[in-house]
């Protein structure tokens, strides 16, 4: 049975099997339905619902939900247009917008107590960032051919320094595959751990007696401020992911 109470700061990040598939002939252990699968489906349906069901119902002035959705859309649109520029930004806007909303929603859902932190799993997030990096590299090679490798030679570099700078640029370029996901995962993981630990300590303090409950109200305000900060970080991290994705695409499209 799935335990609904967190007994360890790391319980929120543990993948549990919710439904197993067994067969006397075949091994279906890799097809188990886990908390990771459940929350991935929840995030996907939430993203689809927010984008498909939020309409203005043919009104001149849309609802608050529609206005907020339109504001997010315009923000990402202007960011992609400013980052990629040229005539190609429109081809990649849907990709960046989808990634922004997926990470944004998964971060917000992970803020719900006793929920599962999808974006805190390093393997999953680094896999996403690696796919973006690999896709951008393929786009660059397809568009420019061997000229793509001029990206690793900064303009105006003295000839004796070319081997060293090429090595540095190569290491920096390959590190993008990991750094994009590592940045998001580490921020979400550290923030959630801080909230769980401080929240647990505060709960234990306030449940001891009436006096400690009253004294616990003061640090409770500080904890509430940290929660608000974590909500802000959830939005910022999704936006940073989108900016860096657009920047990587710009580099391979225009080789600078």
Curated annotation (Swiss-Prot):
GO terms for cellular component: mitochondrial inner membrane; proton-transporting ATP synthase complex. F-type ATPases have 2 components, CF(1) - the catalytic core - and CF(0) - the membrane proton channel. CF(1) has five subunits: alpha(3), beta(3), gamma(1), delta(1), epsilon(1). CF(0) has three main subunits: a, b and c. InterPro entries: ATP_synth_F0_asu (IPR000568), ATP_synth_F0_asu_AS (IPR023011), ATP_synth_F0_asu_bact/mt (IPR045083), F0_ATP_A_sf (IPR035908). The gene is ATP6. It comes from the Eukaryota. GO terms for molecular function: proton-transporting ATP synthase activity, rotational mechanism. This is ATP synthase subunit a. Residues 1-7 form a propeptide. It is found in: Mitochondrion inner membrane. It holds the Pfam family ATP-synt_A. The chain crosses the membrane at residues 33-53, 92-112, 122-142, 148-168, 188-208, 209-229. Belongs to the ATPase A chain family. Mitochondrial membrane ATP synthase (F(1)F(0) ATP synthase or Complex V) produces ATP from ADP in the presence of a proton gradient across the membrane which is generated by electron transport complexes of the respiratory chain. F-type ATPases consist of two structural domains, F(1) - containing the extramembraneous catalytic core and F(0) - containing the membrane proton channel, linked together by a central stalk and a peripheral stalk. During catalysis, ATP synthesis in the catalytic domain of F(1) is coupled via a rotary mechanism of the central stalk subunits to proton translocation. Keywords: ATP synthesis, CF(0), Hydrogen ion transport, Ion transport, Membrane, Mitochondrion, Mitochondrion inner membrane, Transmembrane, Transmembrane helix, Transport. CDD domains: ATP-synt_Fo_a_6.
